[in-house]
């Protein structure tokens, strides 16, 4: 599809409908363990997954569509259509001058962690498959402007690799997983252990990126103070997420994963790019000081590995773009983060003009759409 606006957003979220899993899974087999929306005693509605109410102060995250950006829906009747209906989403994309949208979940967790936390592996696998099929059957089927990505069951490396193959075979263009699978589900190996190598090998073979959305690894971020109200907590959470992405890039490099799997492409959306120069400079410094080439067999500088295999995303920041040549203009993607409160919607064009005012045309096109088109193999 030819570009109309010259913008691809690589991090937007869909809202799963309340009956997604209940209409696709056996109530006789799974009962109330099926993910579903349940009215609470106070009249609000919340997602309940495997019998556990999902933590959070809302049913959905749609702040970009609220009048003050701070309020979130408490019942399904308050959820805007553009977050769950592809046709309404396309209208929102047109109004905000967005050509393509790479999709992430919401109720399932930004990286599928809410589904990944399910202890029963068979239930976890079935829930992941239902979500992945829905994305293809409803969103991808609505037109080529939606770029589908699959969540994977993390309770078993074998199951994760199998679902990755099945989902990509159906048309998914990326894979999503939590940044700390072992803390999401005790049955999962630590991300940096070689038990995950069969998955990395499958991802290389499938030739799709693996994506670690910011916020899916809370253990590597500062805790939110219990003294904060909901609005302040949301602001703090958005700022702290860069620390999580920096730690994940650090770990993916120093663990040797990206040295062993040289074709693996990793995306770190949702945390901006300002932190990247510090992270790369610190990694290179420690690589030299700790003699990691000699002692650990990490024969290339970490920054070289990053420039070969990692992507980061920008949306709100101007300062980070001034360091684009150190980060690598070919390693930066643009995102809207629709429909979350931190999204550029409905002012994406204005913010792009402001943030990219001193970026040359070639680099601007790289970041706004060419890199994403290459990564997701889009015919544009």
Predicted segment positions?
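Mid-to-C-terminal alpha-helical segments outside catalytic/metal-binding sites
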Residues: 2-8, 17-72, 77-80, 84-100, ...
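Short, solvent-exposed turn/loop segments enriched in Gly/Ser/Thr/Pro and often Arg
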Residues: 10, 40-41, 104-110, 150-155, ...
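Di-metal (Zn2+ and/or Mg2+/Mn2+) metal-binding site signature of metallo-dependent hydrolases
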Residues: 13-14
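Short aromatic-enriched loop/helix-cap "lid" or pocket-rim segments at secondary-structure transitions
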Residues: 19-22, 113-116, 222-225, 278-282, ...
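Surface-exposed, active-site-proximal loop segments in enzymatic domains
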Residues: 69-74, 109-123, 155-158
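Catalytic pocket-lining loop regions of alpha/beta-barrel enzymes
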Residues: 123-124, 139-147, 152, 158, ...
């Amino acid at each position: 599809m030819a570009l109309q606006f010259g913008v691809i957003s690589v991090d937007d979220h869909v809202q799963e409908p309340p009956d997604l899993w209940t209409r696709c899974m056996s109530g006789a087999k799974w009962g109330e363990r099926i993910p579903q929306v349940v009215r609470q005693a106070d009249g609000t509605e919340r997602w309940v997954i495997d019998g556990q109410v999902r933590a959070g102060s809302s049913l959905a995250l749609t702040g970009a569509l609220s009048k003050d950006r701070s309020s979130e829906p408490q019942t399904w009747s308050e959820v805007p259509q553009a977050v769950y209906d592809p046709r309404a989403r396309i209208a929102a994309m047109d109004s905000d001058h967005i050509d393509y949208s790479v999709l992430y979940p919401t109720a399932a967790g930004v990286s599928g962690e809410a589904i990944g936390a399910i202890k029963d592996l068979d239930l976890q696998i079935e829930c992941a498959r239902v979500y992945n099929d829905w994305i293809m059957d409803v969103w991808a089927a609505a037109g080529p402007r939606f770029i589908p990505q699959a969540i994977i069951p993390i309770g078993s490396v074998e199951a994760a690799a199998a679902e990755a193959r099945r989902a990509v075979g159906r048309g998914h263009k990326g894979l999503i997983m939590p940044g700390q699978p072992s803390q999401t589900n005790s049955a999962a190996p630590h991300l940096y252990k070689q038990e995950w190598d069969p998955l990395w090998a499958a991802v290389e073979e499938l030739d799709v990126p693996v994506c670690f959305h910011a916020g899916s690894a809370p253990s590597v971020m500062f805790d939110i103070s219990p003294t904060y109200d909901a609005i302040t907590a949301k602001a703090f959470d958005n700022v702290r997420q860069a620390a999580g992405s920096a730690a994940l890039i650090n770990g993916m490099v120093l663990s040797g994963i990206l040295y062993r799997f040289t074709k693996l492409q990793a995306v770190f959306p949702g945390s901006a790019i300002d932190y990247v120069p510090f992270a790369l400079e610190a990694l290179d410094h420690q690589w030299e000081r700790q003699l990691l080439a000699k002692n650990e067999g990490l024969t290339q500088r970490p920054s070289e590995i990053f420039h070969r295999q990692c992507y980061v995303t920008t949306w709100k920041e101007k300062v980070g773009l001034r360091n684009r040549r150190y980060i690598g203009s070919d390693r930066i993607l643009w995102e809207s983060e629709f429909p979350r409160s931190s999204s550029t919607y409905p002012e994406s064009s204005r913010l792009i003009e402001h943030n990219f005012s001193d970026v040359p045309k070639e680099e601007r096109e790289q970041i706004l759409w060419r890199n994403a088109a290459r990564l997701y193999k889009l015919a544009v």
